[in-house]
Every structure is written in C-alpha cells, then in structure tokens.
Amino acid sequence: DAGTAYITIPSTSVKNTRWEFGVHLTFNPSANNYARFYLTSSSNILSGNLNGYYIQIGGAKDNVALYRQNGNQSKLLASGRELMKGNSSPKLYIKVERDNNGYWTFWTRLESENEYVKEKQIKDTDIQTSRYCGIYCIYTKTRCKGFTFHHIQLSNDVETNTSPDETPDNPDTDLPDNPDTPELPRDVRGMLLFNEIMYNNATDGAEYVEIYNPTEQAVILPAL
C-alpha cells in the first residue's frame, strides 16, 4: 500500500562531517514518490516533528535539494540541477559536507558521470545538535519496492571554509552489476556503513538492514 518507511541509527555528528551515499530509484521521482536522507535529526521518528537537516531526492522537481526542518515545517536551503529529469531509473551518488563554521556544501554524480558536480554551498547554523541520521521514503503502492540506498559513509574530517561561493536559493521562488566501492578514509574510528537495506519484502520474505563496521573495534548501538 501507499505510505512511508524509514530507518535511523544514533548519530551526533554535525560539525566537520561528510555524508556520502548512492541512490537507485526504479522510477522517475514525483511529488508522491521521493526519498529523504536525514543528515541530522532530533528524533528517530522521521515521519513526525523533528529538528534536523535532510537531502531530498526528487519531489516536485527532479533534483537533489538541501532542507532544514523545524518541527513539521521544512525550509529549502539549496536546490541542485534537475539531473533526474526524464530518467525512469535514476542512479546517482550524493556527497554532503558541513564544516565547523556552518557552511553546507553538496555534490551530485550520475552513475554515467566520472566526477562529482558541485551543486550549492550555503551557511546555516540554526540547528547545532543531532541524535540520529536515517532514510525516509514516501511512495505509492506501485513504487514501494523501488528505493535502494547503498555505499553509505559518514566521516568527520571536513576542512573549514571561510565564505560561501554560491548565492543561496530563495525558498519562495539500476545499481551497477559490480559497483565500485568508495575508498574509506584512513581513520575510520567510530564509522559505520549501511551496506544494504531491504524493506517491504515479499509476503514471506524478511525485512532487514545490514550494517558494516570496517574497523577492528567493537561498536555498541544502544538503539536501532
């Protein structure tokens, strides 16, 4: 049936943080079928009121955009190119950085592109803390199995910028057969990777999330 699905893990990272992930949609996104990657969130219930930042993939436009959410109100901070326009099965990679001074920068790359394209940079320090990060999908009945997130990484080695190089937006106005695994940073302490997510599986199938710890240290998850 039509509805929403989400998954979260504890995460307090905000400053000097980089988020990277791949997305594959088996449909062209629309106002009724799109996804959000919550970079930060005050709540583990992504369908309710919360304070945080998220990247939206699709929606009214076939692009990737950065939003800030306060309670149940979302504000567009920066909007990227319409890289999914006319694409019935978009495959893309997204990278977001937030430095110590509050500058947010995000890049996108289609699977067919060799390098990331810098979309926008904007300063926003309205929300300084986080408790979770996660994935949130909104879908109609026929699209409920059409979302795949992969190669998810979070690291804390972002350099600090001094000034934005882009003008902020005015809010008023198939996975590869053998995908390349991004190289991990040398220091991966405290880093966890979402390796695979499966939800709304067949009637007799199991739903699961696979989390990979690339370090040699044990990591305790108090909640999932």
Label each PLM-derived region with a short phrase.
Residues 182-224:
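A structural motif detector for short, solvent-exposed N-terminal "entry" segments of globular domains
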